[in-house]
């Protein structure tokens, strides 16, 4: 085979493999995304491997004498060094004060600030209990149970001033996806957290964009192709005041170095039925959205606040004055929003609560 054809085939192979890697991993094209750095390293290794295959080196001496491989190796090491330096300089080790200030905390008096809650607004079920009810409801739907299952999402939201959990159906298997994906997902589950009433809400238009899809209608891939530079946090399945299903997609903003100080700067709302996307700042987000800030991120930010009170070294060794959230958290419906609440304890692990924290997910 002619050298020109071999070169063209190798170039095509590199492009195809890089394209497949990008399509599968869908990293954000953003300097703050660790995924894009890994993608760059992958492409560099592919290029060097293709060049070595074209040249058909027969000895280590030939490899060492190749100017192209030397330059490629230097570029590869430079990318690795920048990535490593960025990771260290973005960490709490050198930015303890900035990490502690990620979340604004107000100390309040419980008896003065917290009013008695209407019992009709107190969730009586946790997520595990809701999952049991959801699976039981799905099992009774003889026309769907062989083709669909219930997703494990179970997002807690406020719907018409009631705390409910909502979760979409998913295809029962890849084969069931293949036979049903043209029609989409026909319903979602809604559970009233105060009365335990469980309903399967059938939709006039099916859900076509979800985590259960495998190709372009996969919600993560759909978002990436619409917003190639956005770094998305944990997605949440919610419904608006009319019961229309949406994906609430928080967009991360990094405020400390390359990879540190993650907060939420924007929210993308994706209609799960049509795939239509709308981009909002946090303050302009529609009122029905309850989970603009993921609970795990808020808890992490509180733990930075509690443990870094006297710097990073103290948080590891002396631990003077260090507090952290207790294991697990739950949700409370208050002021027509969903609040994350968790206990606060010392890092010594004495299992005693010294208070609790309420964080608005808006």
Report residues per predicted region.
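Soluble extracytoplasmic regions of secretory-pathway and membrane proteins
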Residues: 3-362
């Amino acid at each position: 085979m002619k050298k020109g054809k071999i070169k063209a085939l190798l170039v095509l192979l590199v492009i195809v493999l890089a394209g497949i890697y990008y399509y599968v991993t869908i990293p954000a094209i953003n300097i703050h995304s660790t995924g894009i750095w890994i993608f760059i390293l992958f492409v560099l290794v592919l290029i060097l491997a293709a060049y070595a295959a074209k040249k058909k080196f027969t000895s280590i001496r030939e490899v060492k004498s190749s100017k192209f491989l030397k330059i490629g190796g230097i570029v590869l090491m430079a990318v690795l060094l920048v990535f490593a330096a960025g990771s260290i300089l973005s960490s709490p080790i050198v930015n303890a004060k900035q990490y502690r200030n990620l979340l604004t905390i107000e100390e309040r008096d419980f008896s003065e600030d917290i009013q008695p809650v209407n019992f009709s607004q107190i969730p009586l079920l946790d997520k595990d209990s809701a999952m049991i009810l959801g699976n039981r409801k799905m099992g009774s739907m003889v026309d769907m149970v062989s083709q669909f299952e219930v997703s494990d999402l179970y997002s807690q939201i406020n719907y018409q001033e009631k705390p409910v959990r909502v979760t979409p159906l998913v295809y029962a298997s890849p084969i069931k996806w293949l036979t049903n994906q043209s029609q989409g997902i026909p319903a979602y589950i809604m559970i009233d957290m105060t009365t335990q009433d469980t309903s399967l809400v059938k939709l006039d238009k099916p859900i076509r964009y979800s985590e259960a899809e495998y190709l372009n209608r996969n919600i993560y891939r759909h978002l990436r192709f619409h917003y190639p530079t956005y770094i998305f946090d944990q997605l949440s399945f919610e419904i608006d005041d009319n019961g229309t299903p949406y994906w609430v997609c928080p967009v991360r903003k990094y405020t400390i170095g390359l990879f540190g100080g993650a907060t939420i700067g924007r929210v993308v709302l994706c209609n799960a039925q049509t795939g239509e996307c709308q981009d909002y700042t946090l303050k302009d987000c529609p009122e029905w959205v309850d989970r603009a800030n993921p609970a795990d991120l808020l808890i992490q930010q509180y733990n930075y606040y509690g443990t870094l009170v006297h710097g990073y070294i103290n948080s590891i060794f002396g631990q003077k004055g260090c507090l952290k959230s207790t294991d697990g958290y739950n949700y409370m419906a208050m002021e027509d929003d969903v609040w994350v609440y968790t206990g606060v304890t010392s890092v010594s692990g004495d299992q005693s609560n010294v208070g609790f924290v309420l964080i608005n997910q808006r």
